[in-house]
Amino acid sequence: MTSATTLLELCDLLDANDILVSGIPEEADANVTGAACDSRCVRKGNVFFCKGRAFKPAFLTSALETGAVAYICDPDHAEELTTTAPSAPAIVTSDMRRAMALVSAAAFGRPDLDVPQVGITGTKGKSTTAYMLSLIHI
């Protein structure tokens, strides 16, 4: 699923949740089509999350070469990553886990809103009914 989310909209989202430290890159109108935290999974138009204990700046370089439009990092790594990729749009957040949840949902077009919900109640037959419903792909 693709979306029309931009870097500016992602920065606004993080700011509205009080976790934006710095951001709003010059390329604020760049379209974001997804998000990834593994440089091997980055696609053109993705935002790349720089996180984890084993994170290496080479992962950011690889993600940008693959087509990442920007990266998101925490304040502890911001200076080092700015040195690694000085021309890349950077967004710095105070809460990486929350940012990953918010940005991923927005970048992928909120697929969680398209999940059908079915309630099955009663004394007997709930498991059978649930199984039968799963087979007809509601």
Regions found by a protein language model. Give the residues of each.
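N-terminal leader/targeting and accessory segments in enzymes
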Residues: 1-102
